[in-house]
Amino acid sequence: MAGNNFTEVTVFILSGFANHPELQVSLFLMFLFIYLFTVLGNLGLITLIRMDSQLHTPMYFFLSNLAFIDIFYSSTVTPKALVNFQSNRRSISFVGCFVQMYFFVGLVCCECFLLGSMAYNRYIAICNPLLYSVVMSQKVSNWLGVMPYVIGFTSSLISVWVISSLAFCDSSINHFFCDTTALLALSCVDTFGTEMVSFVLAGFTLLSSLLIITVTYIIIISAILRIQSAAGRQKAFSTCASHLMAVTIFYGSLIFTYLQPDNTSSLTQAQVASVFYTIVIPMLNPLIYSLRNKDVKNALLRVIHRKLFP
């Protein structure tokens, strides 16, 4: 991949946050706590959905996929960051760097389109409830669950291929993981074409999935406003409030970080935003989708009751 490099780079140094040695212990503890909470919270949600038959619906099928993605896209970055906080080397191999980038970018893209699938599911449930079981069949649900992975990892493969083909003059990545913008800054050659490819792919992923979600919610909100009773409107809105909150947080942080082709944001801002969507959002998702969800709470009570009183 690096055959055209002026200097053969075999190892990168992840120097993000290295200029704040007084924060290394605090950052290590914060990352560790959030990562453990993320893994346990999302694994718990997946396990609960599998154990309770009343949650075997398309909505919770998508939610278990979201939890799976959150575990693994956090795991592509956080464990290596934890090691680096306790190490003086902070190194990652050339291949390891692009493998990390491939899975991270791919899983983030997967989450974008999976959130779109979840929005479509809410649209059918609210706007066409009588046809829900017909429209959201097992085949359709599986298709809506698989396609985000296909699109996400295809997009990621293209992005990683064009960036890994660049010539790199430096091996010090000013970030805590192999981020696309930080790697582009190390190139010896003109990166305009590569930046445009990355920008178009990011724009397609973010804007196309966000367009699907936006149009879907315009229709949903219009349908909710036509409901006569206040109680009915409240019940309908409560079924999609958690998803809408998760979408707002996730897309807001991604757009702030990546949809800036002129690279006007500082690297410090990018790192702070990256911390948020890399480790914080995967932790928040199980809380957002479970604390306000009566079905999940009731399922947890049923599982506990079965275990205590078999």
UniProtKB/Swiss-Prot annotation:
Glycans are attached at N5. Residues 47-54, 121-139, 217-236, 292-310 are cytoplasmic. InterPro entries: GPCR_Rhodpsn (IPR000276), GPCR_Rhodpsn_7TM (IPR017452), Olfact_rcpt (IPR000725). Residues 1-25, 76-99, 161-196, 258-270 are extracellular. The keyword Cell division does not apply. The keyword Transferase does not apply. Disulfide bonds join C97-C188. Pfam families: 7tm_4. The chain crosses the membrane at residues 26-46, 55-75, 100-120, 140-160, 197-216, 237-257, 271-291. It is found in: Cell membrane. Keywords: Cell membrane, Disulfide bond, G-protein coupled receptor, Glycoprotein, Membrane, Olfaction, Receptor, Sensory transduction, Transducer, Transmembrane, Transmembrane helix. One of its GO terms (molecular function) is G protein-coupled receptor activity. GO terms for biological process: G protein-coupled receptor signaling pathway; sensory perception of smell. Belongs to the G-protein coupled receptor 1 family. Odorant receptor. This is Olfactory receptor 8I2. The gene is OR8I2.
